[in-house]
Curated annotation (Swiss-Prot):
Disruption phenotype: Depletion results in abnormal membrane phospholipid composition, defects in cell division and cell death.
UniProt organism field: Borreliella burgdorferi (strain ATCC 35210 / DSM 4680 / CIP 102532 / B31) (Borrelia burgdorferi)
UniProtKB keywords: Cell inner membrane, Cell membrane, Membrane, Transmembrane, Transmembrane helix
Domain of life assignment: Bacteria
Broad class of where this protein is predominantly found: membrane
Known role: Required for proper cell division and envelope integrity.
Localization per record: Cell inner membrane
UniProt-recorded name of the protein: Inner membrane protein BB_0250
Chain segments annotated as transmembrane: 17-37, 58-78, 101-121, 139-159, 172-192
Membrane topology category: Multi-pass membrane protein
GO CC terms: plasma membrane
Family: Belongs to the DedA family.
Other facts: Can restore normal growth and cell division to a E.coli double mutant lacking both yghB and yqjA.
């Protein structure tokens, strides 16, 4: 029975894979707005899906790249326009101070390194760039190449991973289903935790 449900869901994903570039693009735009969505999980899923449906590889890649890149720009302008109001927490300020130190030491190289760091550090890097003295044009140009580099690397690795699964595992559908469920579950859990923290703060 479980296998039947898994196959039904995977078949539904396969039959609607043409919409995946739009879905991935939209999710990454939301991530740029600080919605707790994992860019790494999306790139992983996109690469694996592309390895199974080669005809959609370019579209999926473009959806992920432009979503990630525009999401970065959104984060930059959030920092530029609203950063001082948003980051009143001491821990947030300490993180931003560290990032600003690296910007001072290494300049735009910080963007290239930061693009490979997961767990919400990316957005902090982009926002601190907006809050600092980095010019918009410099960020937009530098981040274009930083995003291109990181997405190409992660997407290629995910694509190769998907191909390896096809060779090693005959039941690749179950693995993709598990990743799909894990992404959804992680997003929901992070959202609930953040919401509970806000409720606790209001009660205090």
């Amino acid at each position: 029975m479980t296998k039947m449900y898994i196959n039904t869901i995977i078949e539904y994903i396969d039959s609607n894979i043409a919409y995946s570039p739009i879905v991935f693009f939209s999710l990454l735009i939301l991530a740029g707005l600080n919605v707790p969505i994992s860019e790494d999980a999306i790139v992983l899923m996109g690469g694996i899906l592309s390895s199974r449906k080669n005809e959609y590889t370019i579209l999926i890649f473009l959806g992920i790249f432009w979503g990630a890149y525009l999401g970065d720009i959104i984060s930059f302008y959030i920092g530029k326009l609203m950063g001082n109001k948003l980051f009143k927490n001491k821990k947030d300020n300490n993180l931003l101070d560290k990032i600003n130190y690296y910007y001072g030491q290494y300049g735009v190289l910080t963007l290239f390194i930061g693009r490979f760091i997961p767990f919400g550090v990316r957005n902090a890097i982009f926002m601190s760039a907006g809050m600092g003295n980095m010019k918009s044009n410099l960020f937009i140009v530098s981040d274009f190449f930083a995003t291109l580099l990181s997405i190409v690397v992660y997407f290629t690795l995910s694509f190769k991973l998907g191909q390896s699964f096809e060779i090693i595992f005959s039941k690749i559908k179950i693995i993709i289903f598990a990743i799909f469920i894990a992404v959804i579950a992680t997003t929901i859990i992070i959202y609930v935790i953040k919401k509970n923290k806000k409720v606790d703060k209001n009660l205090k």
